[in-house]
Structures are given as structure tokens and as C-alpha cells.
Amino acid sequence: MTILTVRHVTTYRYRRPVALGDHRMMFRPRDSYDQRLIESRLVITPEPVRIHWIHDPFGNCVAIARFKARASELCFESTIRVDHYPDNVPDFQTDPRAKAYPFVYDSEEMPDLMASIARGYPDPNGEIDHWVRKFLLPGRPTPTGKLLMTLTHAIKEGFTYTRRAEHGTQEPIVTVRMGRGSCRDFALLMIEAVRSLGLAARFVSGYLYVPSRDGPEHIGGGSTHAWCQVYLPGAGWVEFDPTNGIIGNRDLIRVAVARDPSQAIPLSGTYAGSPEDELGMKVQVNVVCEDAAMDSMGASA
């Protein structure tokens, strides 16, 4: 058991007071057997006239804020505490039929997994197909766990991480051609790669805890983090982080899951004005382990 505290602050600045449209937030983590939400606090400045909570089609918690006043600065501050149960040594408890690839999902699972199997991005020349099939053993079945772990580490070791300020994700063929991308680009590449093999995969948005850099000033990547899940019969949805080579949920705080990255944007919204009115956006994410923070305080005392 590990208690992690996440402070996520996003600030928009404008040249003059602008009329703010609705803003959609995905800050509240998903409760599950491996992470339990202890506390959640959301402070928005200026204060909205209404905050409306919903569940989206994937069961994610979404808050929608509506504003009345104009403002030259808009700030969202989310603080959460989660009880995290890390899986340090993933054990693929897959059904016997799924221990080696290729395999097929059974008739009970398939209807619910279809949308997560269907590919969402063009690959006219089969570049993704060709790339992922390099990891299959020639002429014989490939152990499923080994295949997915190898693919995860191949992205981590074979591609260059680049923090991109641009919104959205690169198409997977662009990531393969360029050999670089952000965490969301790598997650999407792995999703499309395993989908090309007929496996169900989905996008995950959340936070990353970096133990080696823990402390009051630790910035958990400076932003939100993204990875993916693959559905394995008997094991369920298993986490794979190709940016860091993480298999399982270790150091990953899950906030939202979706079929496509566009459905799991942490914060989005509009304002009435010209593009020149927007001066910029600043995002700061701080992830701290309470046990480590207490140890640090004790050592300095």
C-alpha cells in the first residue's frame, strides 16, 4: 500500500478579460481494487456558477464547469490522494488459450471488445503491421506476455521521447517514421500495433510517480501522463507504459480510460475572443509519496 498525493494546476492567461465557455475536466481517478481514492479537492478561479458531474461512456468521472464572469486568468487546481497498490512483478494470469499468440477472444467477450480492437488510424502501406510483426516468432506461436513486454520495451528503447506542447497526438505511422514522440504518441502507437494483431487495447490518461525524484519539489513529468491497456483473457485489462517500460500499474495513477486519446483529454474548454487574446497556458503536476515525504522530513530534522 502506497499513499500518493497529486497536485495538478493548469493556468490560462489572456490579454484582456474574455468570456469563458464550458470547460470539461477529467481529474478524478478511477476507483478500483488497485487504487482507492481517499480525497479529492477541486478549486477553480474564477469560481464557476455551476459544476456538473457525469460519467462518460467508459465510466470515467467528468466535471463540466460553467462560467458567467469574464476573466483574464483562469486557474484549475486539483488535489487528490490515492491509496495505491502497486503490482511490481506482473503475473499474466491468462487463460490457457491466450498464453500464446495468435489467439481469439471468446463469444462472450468479443461484442464488448470490438470497439477496442478496431483500428482508428490509417496505415495504407502496412507500416504498423510490418513493424509489429517483427516481434513475432517465425513459424510458431509467440508467448503473449513476452510479446507485449518486448513491444513495450522496443518503443522505450527504440524511440526518442519528445515533450510536445501541441495538442492532440501524432498518427502512429508518423511516430514510426520519425522515431520520436510524446507519451501519448507512444501509447497510441502501441495501441494501434496490438490492434493490428487483433487484440483489444485502450488509451489511459493519468499521472506518473517517479520515486527516484521524490520530494517537495518533484514534478511528475511536469504534466499528465499517458499509457495503454491490453485486454488478456483471464488477466483482464493489463497496463503497459511504453514511455517508461512499465508493465503493470507500478507508479501509474489511472484517471481515465478511452478507446481514443481524444476521449481522455484532462482539460478542455473554450473562450469567446480572438486567438491573439490567449497569452499562454502553464501546467504543473506534482506527485509525492507520503511515506517518502515523511522520511525526507525525518532525515532533515
Segments the model singles out, each with a brief description of its role:
Residues 1, 29-38, 156-159, 182-188, ...:
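Short low-complexity stretches enriched in small and charged residues
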Residues 1-137, 141:
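Linear, non-domain "peripheral" regions
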Residues 2, 8, 21-23, 40, ...:
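Structural beta-strand/beta-sheet cores of well-ordered domains, especially the beta-sheet scaffolds
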Residues 12, 16, 25, 42, ...:
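Flexible, active-site-adjacent loop/turn segments at secondary-structure boundaries
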Residues 16, 31, 48, 80, ...:
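A broadly conserved detector of short glycine/acidic/proline-rich loop/turn motifs that flank catalytic sites
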Residues 97-181, 189, 197, 259-261, ...:
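Secondary-structure boundary elements
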Residues 138, 153, 185-275:
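Hydrophobic/aromatic-rich core segments of domains that either
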Residues 248, 264, 272-301:
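Helix-biased "structured C-terminal domain" signature
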